[in-house]
Amino acid sequence: MACTTCELCNVRCCLDLPIEPSWLKLRGRLIHEEGRLTFPPFEIMRASLHKELNIWAAYRADRPRWMPEDKQGMLPERAEVAYFPGCTASYVEHDIAQATACLLTKAGVEFTYLGHDEACCGIPMLVSGLWDTWEEILRHNVEAMKARGVKTVVTSCPACWLVWHTLYPEWAAKLGIDYHFEAKHWSEVVADQIAAGKMAFDHALDMKVTWHDSCHMGRAGKIYEAPRQVIQAIPGVELVEMEHNRQEAHCCGSVLSLVADPPAAARIGNLRLQEATATGAEALIASCPCCEVQLRVSADKSGCNLPIIDLAHLACDAAGLQHPDPTSYALAMWGVFEGMINLLKPEAMAGFMASLLPEMIEAMPQPFRGMMHMVKASPGPLRDGMIAMMKPVMPFLFPRLLPGMMPKVMPAMLAGVGERIAMPTEMEEQMPDLLPAAMDNLMPKMLPAVIPHFMPYMEAYLKGQPARGTARS
């Protein structure tokens, strides 16, 4: 279930079966019809979306921060074209949003921007099966665009493009929502202006590059030529293709794989980096913020020195407009995210819960709290016998006790998360809201996978033995 959503299976299937769309539907049905658990990190994202409209646990008010101060307040409130940067370009890789806005201006496009009214496009919620939140986000963004008189939505992120071009209209039809928007990737807009002789780049860059076709814009959207036309219009730049390109292009390893299985995602990313390096290119050019994060993370972990450069960033360099390299900040933010992913694995969560055993026992209602104290204080043979009697009962009892215990344990849990994960200030400030909301959804469904790992810790604690792996870092 934790695939990359790259759709290569659809291309390779000799029976032309809709494999990836079927997986997409299955995830939603498993969660909404069978009450299954989604990939745990998506519950943190969902809590952030509900509170601040983004997946990075940043503040909604800070979404426009990517925009240079001299540009803020300069865009029209209403326009037929809107620029939709998406979460990662807005909060992590600012160069993408800054460069795209500059290129649209250079192309003569008058555009508006939702600012702090922009929400995540919602695709993380859709692919993880959290369709109720996906629908909320869809309605929010569509209404926000309508309020500004928008007819065309221009995106940086290929996933955002896929949402506005394909997924929103499909769901709007099912939900009875009026939907009239055209969607374009910025490279299509700029390529059209270049072809019409209305736009050109005047700074030669003198470099050899290769191009990574994003799955959501490539295989899913068939946008192959516009990005290449932009690259080929830059003086001094030589484009060399990777072995697997266009429809056959290999995925970077992001989306569900990156969240559910980071080591597998890193291996997939390394394969793409090796293919790029084999071309002799001096840089790998991409146009997907999430691809770029994933490729940067894979390069960092594998020791690959090939620079990952966003296409808009490259094009702005060719226009004489410089933007900062986001690599260091992107790696730091991914480190926070990966820390949360690792903490939410069942075995890690069991160890984390074990570190909170004193608080958990004190949070138990009577008579269970007293029973735990009695077991811990009993002499060896009697204690061991009582523990043996408890062990088969706890998997059934613990899920019933936990909802009442969580509010009392939450302060210690928040402190433990803060000790384990070096969060940015805005994320740490929001954790008292985000973590309880996520745990309310997670724990009832996650406990069956956690309890087998947790019980040995609990038994060791009651016997007065050190429970390895429970120390707070």
Task: Show where each model-derived region lies.
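A polyampholytic, Gly/Pro-enriched intrinsically disordered region
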Residues: 132-137, 198-213, 258-268, 325-344
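Redox- and metal-dependent alpha/beta enzyme cores, enriched for Fe-S-associated oxidoreductases
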Residues: 195-199, 209, 214-263, 351
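Short, flexible loop segments at boundaries between secondary-structure elements
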Residues: 175-203, 244-247, 300-338
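Amphipathic, rod-like alpha-helical scaffolds used for oligomerization/assembly
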Residues: 344, 348-470
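Iron-sulfur-cluster electron-transfer modules
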Residues: 1-172, 332-348, 352-360
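A short, acidic, amphipathic alpha-helical segment used as a generic capping/interface helix at domain edges
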Residues: 263-282
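Helix N-cap/beta->alpha junction signal
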Residues: 156-159, 187, 288
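Conserved hydrophobic helix-helix packing surfaces used for dimerization/oligomerization
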Residues: 81-83, 209, 284
